[in-house]
Amino acid sequence: MSGCEEEAGDGYSSAEDEDYVPSGAEYSEEDESELLREEEEEAAGPRPTRSRNSPRQATRRKKKKRRGLVLEVDEKEEGKAQENEDEEDDLKQSEKDREEEEKKKEDALWASFLSDVGQKPKAAATQATHADKAGEVKSVNKLQGKPKESEKPKDSGRVTITKVFDFAGEEVRVTKEVDSSSKEAKSFLKQQEKWQSSAPGSLPTVSGVKRPSGISSLLGKIGSKKQKMSTLEKSKLDWENFKEEEGIVEELAIHNRGKDGYIERKAFLERVDHRQFEIERDIRLSRMKP
């Protein structure tokens, strides 16, 4: 009895017991079944009290104590795991907050840079899109306006004149457009009216034979009376045709209007001759006076 009392006393050490199980060790199936049975008995009702120092009660106390130690160890491990998870969450949150602060700083720097420059990328992009749309609208309007200009009647301000010449037995046709108010156009129109009026009003027509009329008849009359063309006129005509084919009419006109152009030199010499003539005339008039 004295041995049992010593084991149940306050100086009892579980490490000295033969049935001692270290903390964290698993229970055997027998221990678990016995513990469950004890819990059921305690829940069923009070049992007759036995001696506190009985060996059965001592073993029960040992097992309960071991179970309490295991539960404490599990709770400590769970608490440590929870603390580790909380620390990881805090680290992630702090990193996220730091990234947001850096992003805000970058945005502030970029906004200050744009305010110093005085331009905003979005505004510039919108202006570019508006400019592109305006250019497209203008180009469409131009394309729509060009056909209207081409639809104007040809005889509103220009007259096409076709002349037939005879150069060394060869028929040469010259076609050009002139203003309707020019002398050449007026004379051509008068001549055309004269030929139309001189044509017989009523000639007997034969069935199946069509009488030539309009421009074809006029060209036939012009062809019957071909004008002679000189070599100088033929060379001038060839030169004009060559300029039109090569597309150098405007370039030659600009060059001739320059200081080194032939026309400008010719005009300068004419002005000098005219000025010299005026000086000589003034001298003669001054001598003739008494």
Swiss-Prot record:
User: Which Pfam family is one of those matched by this entry?
Assistant: BCNT
Residues covered by the BCNT-C domain = 209-290
List compositional bias (Acidic residues) regions by residue number: 1-20, 27-43
The UniProt keyword set, sorted, is: Centromere, Chromosome, Developmental protein, Kinetochore
List all Low complexity biased stretches. 120-129, 213-222
Q: Name one GO cellular component term.
A: Swr1 complex
Basic and acidic residues bias spans: 91-108, 146-157, 175-193
Q: Which GO terms of type biological process are on file?
A: chromatin remodeling
Q: Where in the cell is it found?
A: Chromosome, Centromere, Kinetochore
Q: Which PANTHER family match?
A: CRANIOFACIAL DEVELOPMENT PROTEIN 1 (PTHR48407:SF1)
Protein name in the entry: Craniofacial development protein 1
